[in-house]
Amino acid sequence: MDPRPIGVFDSGLGGLTAVRQLRRVLPGEDIVYFGDTGRVPYGSRGRDTIVQYARQDIRFLLSRDVKFIIAACGTVSSTYPPEEAARLPVPFTGVVGATARAAVDATRNRKIGIIGTAATVRSGSYAAVILSLIHI
């Protein structure tokens, strides 16, 4: 087993919910959490600024020698370029896929409301993933 910690970041403290869930399902894993409370919220910023902040957050976690990075931030998850994520030296995931899957699994009438920051909604990422999951 890889002894390195899992890295989790958010634009604030909301990602601590993800950390709590990780601790529940992976009790033996160490976790490094970075909450960027100095620049919260990310969602009112432009795309380039959000990506710049995400890069800085990721660099910080990589400096802590993490084995996996989770962006527990809907804004970063919907804005960070997938091609950049693919080039990282460790696996990277965000929250869009898991959140969209939970919404699709929970709906009874195939109607899902999306509440998010301006940047998250503007990205269209949740709508795209949800539509792909329900095959509309």
Enumerate the predicted regions with their spans.
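Conserved small/polar residues in nucleotide/adenosyl-binding loops
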Residues: 134-136
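Glycine/small-residue-rich loop that forms an oxyanion/phosphate-binding "nest" at active or ligand-binding sites
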Residues: 68-70, 74-110, 115
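A short, Lys/Arg-enriched amphipathic alpha-helix followed by its capping loop at the start of a domain
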Residues: 21-29
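Extreme N-terminal starter segment of soluble prokaryotic enzymes
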Residues: 2-6
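N-terminal beta-loop-helix "entrance" segment that forms/cooperates
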Residues: 33-54
